[in-house]
Regions:
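Short coil turns that delineate tetratricopeptide repeat
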Residues: 31, 65, 99-100, 134-136, ...
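TPR alpha-solenoid repeat register
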Residues: 70, 105, 139-141, 175, ...
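Alpha-helical segment of the N-proximal tetratricopeptide repeat
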Residues: 32-63, 80
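Canonical tetratricopeptide repeat
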Residues: 39, 73, 107-108, 142-144, ...
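Terminal, low-structured helical/coil segments at or just beyond the last alpha-helical repeat
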Residues: 25-33, 201-254
Length: 254
C-alpha cells in the first residue's frame, strides 16, 4: 500500500474520534474514504483476493456512488468475479459520470464490451476515447477499435481504424500485422507482403508473423521466399503452434 493510501486511511480512522464540522465536511470525508476503499479494492484485486476487493468497492460505492473511480473499480471487480451484468452496469455508470472528460473510463468500458458484451458498442466507445482532446494516445483507441471490428467480422471497418492508428504512429506494430492478415484474407498478397515487411522492420518477428509471411509467399508461388520463412519458423520458434502447422503441412505434402 502506498504512503498516500496509508495517510488517507489514518485520516479516515481519526474521523470517528473527532466531531464533524457539518454536512459539507461529512460529504468531503465520504469522498476521501471512498477513494481509499476504491484504491484498496484494486490492491486486493491484484492479490487475487476477490472477496476483500468486493467488500471494499461496495463500501466505496456506498460512500460515494458518483465517483468515477469507484464505478470503474467496481467494473474491474465484478468482471473478475464473472458477474458480467453488474460489471457492464458499473462501466456504463462510469462513462455517464465521466462524460468526455475521462477517456480512460471510455477505454475501460470499451475493452469490456468488446471482450464480453456488445462489440459495436465497444467500438463506439473506443472512437469516443480517440476523439477526446484529453487522450494522449488516440492511436491505441483506434487500434483497439480495429481489433473489436475484426473480431466482429467486419474487416473493412477494422482496416479503416487500423489505418487511422498508423496515420498517427506509422510504425505501430499491431495495426501493421492486422492489416497484413486482412489483406492476405482478401487475396491482396502484394499489399499483405508489404505490411509484413513493415511489421518486421518495426518489431521483432513472432511465430505468427513468420507463419503469415510463409503463407503469403506460398500463395504467391515464391518457393524460395516461402522456404526461408519456413526455415526461420523451425529455427526460431520450434515449439510454436505455427511450427506444428508447418510440420503437418509438409508431412501431408510428402
Amino acid at each position: 500500500m502506498s504512503r498516500r493510501t496509508l495517510a488517507v486511511v489514518a485520516a479516515v480512522a481519526l474521523l470517528g474520534a473527532a466531531p464533524l464540522a457539518g454536512a459539507q465536511q461529512t460529504q468531503a470525508d465520504r469522498e476521501k474514504a471512498a477513494a481509499v476503499n476504491a484504491e484498496l479494492a484494486i490492491t486486493y484485486l491484484k492479490q487475487d483476493n476477490l472477496r476483500a476487493a468486493r467488500e471494499k468497492v461496495d463500501k466505496a460505492l456506498e460512500q460515494n456512488p458518483r465517483s468515477v473511480e469507484a464505478q470503474m473499480t467496481a467494473g474491474f471487480v465484478y468482471d473478475r468475479l464473472g458477474e458480467d451484468k453488474k460489471a457492464a452496469s458499473h462501466y456504463d455508470q462510469a462513462v455517464k459520470l465521466a462524460g468526455k472528460d475521462n477517456p480512460d473510463a471510455l477505454n475501460n468500458a470499451a475493452v469490456f464490451q468488446c471482450r464480453k458484451g456488445d462489440k459495436k458498442r465497444g467500438e463506439e466507445l473506443f472512437l469516443q476515447a480517440a476523439a477526446s482532446p484529453l487522450y494522449r494516445t488516440p492511436e491505441i483507441a483506434y487500434m483497439n477499435a480495429g481489433n473489436c471490428a475484426r473480431a466482429d467480422g467486419r474487416p473493412k471497418d477494422a482496416e479503416r481504424y487500423f489505418r487511422q492508428a498508423l496515420a498517427r504512429r506509422p510504425n505501430m506494430p499491431d495495426p501493421l500485422l492486422q492489416l497484413a492478415f486482412i489483406q492476405h484474407e482478401a487475396g491482396n498478397n502484394m499489399q499483405a507482403r508489404a505490411f509484413v515487411q513493415r511489421y518486421h522492420d518495426a518489431a521483432p518477428a513472432t511465430a505468427q508473423s513468420i507463419w503469415l509471411g510463409y503463407s503469403i509467399e506460398r500463395d504467391q508461388g515464391d518457393a524460395v521466399a516461402a522456404e526461408e520463412y519456413a526455415r526461420r519458423l523451425r529455427m526460431e520458434f520450434p515449439t510454436s503452434v505455427e511450427a506444428g502447422q508447418l510440420f503437418d503441412q509438409e508431412r501431408k505434402a510428402q
